[in-house]
């Protein structure tokens, strides 16, 4: 919304986990990593930022507790702190503040998201750092937005604001007073409940914004615009729009998504399909391809581990295309190869990415060229290596 009104924006993510980066984390734990233009493996949220804003992310836009501690310890080992006792405050919090300010050119706004939940031990240094940052940089130049969950109890047909009140109380106890509260809810929040949040959380009623379940995620910017979220942000900073906001692209996309009648089924076969975020970039690419072609893409996720030959015909019966993404390890490879064979014989459009393409070569070698023990030397040293590491050539 700020970008559409002529402002230059930078988006950043701070993750409280102790991993240095998400590159070596299991997709089951954290979903798929997002690779930035400069080659960094970062949190998948940076992918959401890029898709919504069309602003390219950099390695400097994502940091973790693990990276921060690693940097501080390396500096201490080199004598960078001149023998001082290294502590969370000020040394860790100073490093967090450096991250917020680092690599900024001529952006008007820097939006930093802190992962986790208020009250988590892991998040405390980040909350303390933004408290200090606001105090040092100026309260009129820093805006705190708190995202909170407002549950709807179906049994009693009521919305509960107590979790939000306690969350804000916890945040204020650390020294951070939210300026805007965004309330995530399944149902629209009645005015009297919003007034209650405003009263107990010390936030103006117009700054209590609801984000209700929408039919498609692309309706979210329109919803925020209708509630004047961008207007309240600019009002806080005493700024005016540089140009009139243009939400027609979002309205156009929403209209296509909601009114498209034609559907295509695309199967994704992989090891991590049980976690929706494990192949997030593929999901988004296919959905966006559907929008561009005025069709709804129905994604069928099939786990490769237990995929049997007898099941393939049934599971791939009505698919318009097959996608096998990247991966590693022997587990699930035979299921992928069997599915590729079926797609080739039935002339189903197929796309293999990285490991998926390697398995396509193995399948062709085995079933078309009749090389019975064809395989990858990465998985089996005794196979006929139609796929091999470059140092084995």
Task: Name every feature range the model reports, one short phrase each.
Residues 300-302:
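Structural recognition of alpha-helix starts/caps
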Residues 1-295, 304-321, 329, 336-342, ...:
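Flexible phosphate-sensing "switch/lid" loops adjacent to ATP/NTP-binding sites
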Residues 1-4, 318-393:
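Cysteine-nucleophile active-site neighborhood
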């Amino acid at each position: 919304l700020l970008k559409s009104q002529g402002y230059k924006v930078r988006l950043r993510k701070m993750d409280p986990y102790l991993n240095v980066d998400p590159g070596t984390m299991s997709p089951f734990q954290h979903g798929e990593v997002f690779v930035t233009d400069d080659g960094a493996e970062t949190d998948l949220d940076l992918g959401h930022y890029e898709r919504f804003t069309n602003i390219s992310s950099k390695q400097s836009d994502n940091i973790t507790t693990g990276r921060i501690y690693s940097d501080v310890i390396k500096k201490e080992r080199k004598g960078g702190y001149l023998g001082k006792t290294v502590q969370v405050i000020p040394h860790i919090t100073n490093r967090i503040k450096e991250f917020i300010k680092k690599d900024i050119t001529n952006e008007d706004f820097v939006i930093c998201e802190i992962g986790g939940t208020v009250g988590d031990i892991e998040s405390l240094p980040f909350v303390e750092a933004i408290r200090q940052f606001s105090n040092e940089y100026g309260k009129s130049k820093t805006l705190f937005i708190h995202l909170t969950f407002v549950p709807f109890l179906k049994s009693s047909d009521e919305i509960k604001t107590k979790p939000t009140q306690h969350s804000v109380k916890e945040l204020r106890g650390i020294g951070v007073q939210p300026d805007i509260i965004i309330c995530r809810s399944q149902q629209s929040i009645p005015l009297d409940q919003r007034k209650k949040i405003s009263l107990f959380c010390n936030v103006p009623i117009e700054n209590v914004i609801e984000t209700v379940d929408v039919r498609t995620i692309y309706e979210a910017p329109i919803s925020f615009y209708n509630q004047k979220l961008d207007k309240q942000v600019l009002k806080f900073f005493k700024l005016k729009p540089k140009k009139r906001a243009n939400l027609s692209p979002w309205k156009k996309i929403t209209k296509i998504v909601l009114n498209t009648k034609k559907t295509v089924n695309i199967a994704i076969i992989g090891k991590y399909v049980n976690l929706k975020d494990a192949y997030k970039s593929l999901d988004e690419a296919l959905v966006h391809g559907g929008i561009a072609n005025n069709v709804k893409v129905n994604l069928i996720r099939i786990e490769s581990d237990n995929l049997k030959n007898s099941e393939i015909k049934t599971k791939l019966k009505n698919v318009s295309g097959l996608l096998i993404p990247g991966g590693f390890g022997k587990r699930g490879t035979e299921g992928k190869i069997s599915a590729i064979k079926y797609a080739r014989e039935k002339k189903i459009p197929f796309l293999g990415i990285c490991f998926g393409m390697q398995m396509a070569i193995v399948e062709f070698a085995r079933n078309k060229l009749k090389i019975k023990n064809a395989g990858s030397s990465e998985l089996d040293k005794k196979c006929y290596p139609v796929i091999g590491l470059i140092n084995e050539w």
